[in-house]
Amino acid sequence: MQPTATMATAAATTATVALTTSWDNATSRPTAEPDPILDNYVLLVVVMSLFVGGTLVVLSGVLLLCKRCWEVHQRFNRAMEEAEKTTTTYLDNGTHPIQDPDCRGEDPEGQDTETERFLATSSTGRRVSFNEAALFEQSRKAQDKGRRYTLTEGDFHHLKNARLTHLHLPPLKIATIHECDSGEASAAATPHPATTSKDSLAIFQPPGKTLTGHSVGPSSALPGGPYNSVDFSEISPSTSSDSGEGISLDAGTRGAKAAGPETVPGEMGTGSSGSGTVLQFFTRLRRHASLDGASPYFKVKKWKLEPSQRASSLDTRGSPKRHHFQRQRAASESMEQEGDVPHADFIQYIASAGDSVAFPPPRPFLASPTSPPPTLGRLEAAEAAGGASPETPPEHGISLGPEHAQQQDPQQEQDAEHAQCSYRDLWSLRASLELHAATASDHSSSGNDRDSVRSGDSSGSGSGGGGAAPAFPPPPESPPALRPKDGEARRLLQMDSGYASIEGRGAGDEVSELPAPARSPPRSPRAWPRRPRRDYSIDEKTDALFHEFLRHDPHFDDAPRHRTRAHPHTHARKQWQQRGRQHSDPGGARAATPPGVARPTRAPLRRGDSVDCPPEGRALPITGDDPSIPVIEEEPGGGGGGCPGSGLCVEPAGALLDKLAASLDERLFSPRLAEPVASSQVLIVAAAAPTSPDHSPA
């Protein structure tokens, strides 16, 4: 128990009482001396109190010092750990990031200590290592302005499993939200009254209803499932006037329908104050919720690289740690559209037309009359303005004006009624599309041999100014369109371009160039003429093409099999790949040999051989191949009795030349060396005659 100030005062009062008592005693007995034990006790108490107070002061100072040292130690340790687990190392060029002008007024000191510490370490030309997660923490300022909520594949599967789990929750109501710039965020967050009184365009019905052909739209977003279903509110087209891409929060007006005890009704629709963060979250989450939804119709903004986020350049640089996420993002986002286009048009067109016209199953990806075509990587930008509509058969022409499109409108309505009974799901629709493409390409007058393109019927290109819809019952024959010039022809590389180069113009092309009589499609689907089934068997052309690409060494199979080991040879095709890697055409060099000369037979290559030099241990083939250097062999008795010593005899020059010519004549199959060699100059020419070694396989 430590002495306190109260105890010290109590001791002092005790000492005073004792002093007065001894004073009284001294007056009565003046000669008596004071008690030495009592004096020692008082002195002891005073010294003890002084000692304890000093100890307390020293201890508090030591503790403060230790605390300060511990903080410094922790900071140093944290810096070391960040340097160990760093993900990036940049060579800092001394340019300090300028602070964002929006965030400047928020904190008086400018930036927090993390940034200051990072900037303090970065002097010119030093290597700066840091943990990029610490820098991404800065993006929490300015209400998460550049923040993007990216779903990785793990999150995606987790969400998928969560969707299949039966939670007893009422269906969640989600407003479909377009991404808008920060300037429009205030206008976009204010709720607009719903313009139509009809029920919302419900892409996913609650589990009570049956899923009809209407209810399953082409964009199958993730949150709606067999159990936890989602109603997507429609977009009111009136909002396109004030903000370029408006958000209709009809969930505010009709939110009471779906709000149960678990849902928070104020979260979605009530005020712009409460719903701002949720709207922002769904704005960023919308694209990732479905990987393939209606993405071609939306403009995808690039990531905003804030100046304080130095590590965000990793998204554009190809660092191997990010490749997986770049692939995931590329799978989930559509490509950037060129130019500034109104991106909300498609959904507003659907919402204003009502859900009866929104997703007619025969033509699911028709764009609105004003919206641009979806950007496909295979389409050229120059052709995007006037291309044919998605599945338009080629007879409908390459450029259809709006007048032509309006002539065909009653026809389209009729065809849509017919087709709604037959195309119930995506797969039957796709099969019918393929059949339609097959028959249309038979009648087509677009030259496959010239363009290397199947006509644009199955390419899925979008419609420029309101192109004609596909007529799925037998296509009405309009007069054949003019062929585009070769310069303007689309260079779409399709699957059948290989066939187009092989087959040339088929017989069907000439037939269909005759003007066909106009015929109207029969009324009932059963009366339609039976389309040819698609044949998936491989014909001879495909087989020949296939084997042409997979050809291998022809002498390999003819050689007798060596059974000495289990696998004496490399596999034929593998060996073929390893041998002729650098030569384009295997048969080209040998094809020009004169027919009278017999090709030398070559033993099959064994493991480790190259094409023309066998390894040192193995002798040259007896039949003799083309050697790169002519080998001059000695005569059998050459080293023997004629010249004792080393066998280097000086023979007359004529005999030596005759010998050389004879051996060259045996070794080379060229008829040029048949005449006798006269002089040494001709010999030089003859020795140079074996041309550079032939690297093609035998």
Swiss-Prot record:
Region entry Disordered, spans: 90-124, 185-275, 308-339, 360-421, 438-536, 554-648
Compositionally biased residues, Basic residues: 562-576
Gene that this polypeptide is encoded by: Cbarp
Subunit structure, as described in the record: Interacts with voltage-dependent calcium channels CACNB1, CACNB2, CACNB3 and CACNB4 beta subunits; prevents their interaction with the CACNA1C alpha subunit thereby negatively regulating the activity of the corresponding calcium channels.
Consequence the record notes for mutating N25Q: Loss of N-glycosylation
Residues modified as Phosphothreonine: T691
Its biological purpose: Negatively regulates voltage-gated calcium channels by preventing the interaction between their alpha and beta subunits. Thereby, negatively regulates calcium channels activity at the plasma membrane and indirectly inhibits calcium-regulated exocytosis.
Subcellular locations according to the entry: Cytoplasmic vesicle, Secretory vesicle, Synaptic vesicle membrane; Cell membrane; Cell projection, Growth cone
Top-level taxonomic group: Eukaryota
PANTHER family: VOLTAGE-DEPENDENT CALCIUM CHANNEL BETA SUBUNIT-ASSOCIATED REGULATORY PROTEIN
Biased composition (Basic and acidic residues): 483-493
UniProt name for this protein: Voltage-dependent calcium channel beta subunit-associated regulatory protein
Extracellular side: 1-41
Bias-annotated ranges (Pro residues): 360-375, 471-482
Organism: Mus musculus (Mouse)
Glycan-carrying positions: N25
A GO molecular-function annotation: transmembrane transporter binding
